[in-house]
Amino acid sequence: MTQDPLVSFAGVAKRFGAYTAVHRMDLDIWQGEFLAIMGSSGCGKTTTLRMLAGLEAPSEGVIRLSGKPINDLPSWRRDTPMVWQSLALFPFLSVIENVEFALKMRGVGRAERRRRAEQWLERMGIAEFAGRSIGQLSGGQRQRVALARSLVVEPQILLLDEPLSALDAALKVRMQSVLKQLQRETGITFVYVTHSQSEAFSMADRVVIMSRGRIEQIGTPQDIYRAPLTRFVADFLGSSNIFPGRIARDGQGRTVIATPIGDFALPAGADAESPGQAVSLTVLDTRMQIADHPPQGALNSVPARMVGEEFTGATATIYFETEAGQELRVQKPHQDLADLGLAIGRSFHLSWAPSDGHLVRE
């Protein structure tokens, strides 16, 4: 990108006593993008968001907004409203008074703030609830009020800290669609913290994956899904079979990965790896094939016994175990599994093309 980033973290770290919550971080966030920061509990994602919001002060480094350092700028002067999981709505105010509140604090006149609040309630599809108290609303309706309250001030950037985690599955999916549509229509930069892969991948333009206070990978959902950079990312996403091993040469001089359950051919371009180097081969569970016998000409095949099956809607996930005790899984549409004679305890051969493998560093 040629323009300057809307937000930049330069060497930003956060320590609480002897504990480092965020190690030195460099991150650029661009105008108009939907950025998701994802990771398990304690990875530093919420601390990162709170530093941007002005609720935590960096221990070192500089945070810039529109090119200007904001480390010493109080939260109320940053134009970075935040939506929390708890929503933090005022129960003693009506719906429209909640939406008006930030405008009132900014000195906007009564008529103008009422007009803008009504516009956002209409936009969020909750205009009919303007006079109700917060306690009379459903979870999804409260979520829309919280969004309207944050967006009515027309910020450059909106921060969201796991705002959908308390909603049921169906409502969560609907709200994901609402959020993405709002972001596209307004052009406001969204920074969204979550532990949910489905939320991050369905909405974000780019995803940041964090672990133990460090960024593991930044990229589009497609790039991260297809090509995780590290063993941690592959494990965290949970969509790949992982074969840990070392780079070696087979009897024909070809570069392979030697693992406890066999030697496997590598994708093109892997010859540059050094023999003996510890790596892992990842293969998406959707790219694995199931057969009664070793497929003729297959370079990568491993025998395994079926140990379980999980119904996941339009697809099924079949679980296998190798003789060495490694669990593998295959995910396929139901129609692709109908003629395989699947049964718990039965032995099969799992295979994949070398081009479907991906090497990650340990």
Regions found by a protein language model. Give the residues of each.
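The feature captures the beta-strand-to-loop junction immediately N-terminal to the Walker
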Residues: 38-40
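ABC ATPase nucleotide-binding domain helices that frame the ATP-binding cleft
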Residues: 46-49, 145
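Conserved ABC transporter NBD signature motif
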Residues: 61-69
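ABC ATPase nucleotide-binding domains
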Residues: 34, 79-81, 85, 89-235
